[in-house]
Amino acid sequence: MPGVETIKSSWADEVELDYGGLPPTTENVENGHKYVTEYKYNKDDKKTKVVRTYKISKQVVPKTVAKRRTWTKFGESKSDKPGPNSHTTMVSEEIIMQFLNSKEDEKANDPLLDPTKNIAKCRICNGEHWSVNCPYKGTAMDTNLMEKKAAAAASAAVDAPKSGKYVPPFLKDSQKGGLGMRGRDDTAAIRISNLSESMTEADLEELVKKIGPQSKMYLARDKNTGLCKGFAYVHFKQRKDAAAAIEILNGHGYDHLILSVEWSKPQNN
């Protein structure tokens, strides 16, 4: 009786049977590049071939890192080659760490460097802005502030000789109404600087007329252009008015500039 012949399957069928119908993943290294070829099914249940190309580069790493790469893998990755395996290893997002020293911490905690804190304070309405940008500038609020400062400066000038401090002889003569030995009274004169080039005598008079009566005003002008040199002198009839002018106008914003007002220095004979 003839025996039953067994039909042997081809080696290709056996390979597909062992790997679930998909060929195994292969790696090939050529000319400094590694080519990884793998097969998988797409969403339409069709077999697809995926080829990934990696560029091989060499870099210097610390000894501890190089030693860690020689460790024996275990578990499902026991037979894997050195390096991460995409099937068992997931690389998370890169986290950049920033280390701050104590000086930077102190600088960060400095309240003066806080960008949310406004250091400007208006002298007219006490708002968080400069006085030159105050919306109430020139209104009744500003006028009342100037009157209060003038009254305070006048009272301070009157009470000054009663404090027991030394008063120069020429100041005593000016308070009595005399000119002393100088022949010219500069005790009630002030110097206003940081004026704009477009300043005129009318503007200067308008600036100081509310403070007190003046005996003389001088606006320094350039001989060639006729423009203001940036400073002027004002002689008041009373020293208390001059003191009030310094108190009110010094640091006051005028024509987009901050005025600087001080006592006029006496001329040397």
From Swiss-Prot:
GO MF annotation: an example: translation initiation factor activity
> What task does this protein carry out?
RNA-binding component of the eukaryotic translation initiation factor 3 (eIF-3) complex, which is involved in protein synthesis of a specialized repertoire of mRNAs and, together with other initiation factors, stimulates binding of mRNA and methionyl-tRNAi to the 40S ribosome. The eIF-3 complex specifically targets and initiates translation of a subset of mRNAs involved in cell proliferation. This subunit can bind 18S rRNA.
Cellular component terms (Gene Ontology): eukaryotic 43S preinitiation complex; eukaryotic 48S preinitiation complex; eukaryotic translation initiation factor 3 complex
The RRM domain covers 188-266
Annotated compartments: Cytoplasm
Fetch the PROSITE patterns from UniProt. RRM
Predominant location: cytoplasm
A single GO BP term for this record reads: formation of cytoplasmic translation initiation complex
Q: What is the name attached to this protein's record?
A: Eukaryotic translation initiation factor 3 subunit G-1
State the family named in the UniProt similarity comment for this chain.
Belongs to the eIF-3 subunit G family.
Which keywords, in A-to-Z order, does the entry hold? Answer: Cytoplasm, Initiation factor, Protein biosynthesis, RNA-binding
Gene name, per UniProt, is: eIF3g1
- Give the source's domain of life in one word: Eukaryota
Subunit annotation: Component of the eukaryotic translation initiation factor 3 (eIF-3) complex. The eIF-3 complex interacts with pix.
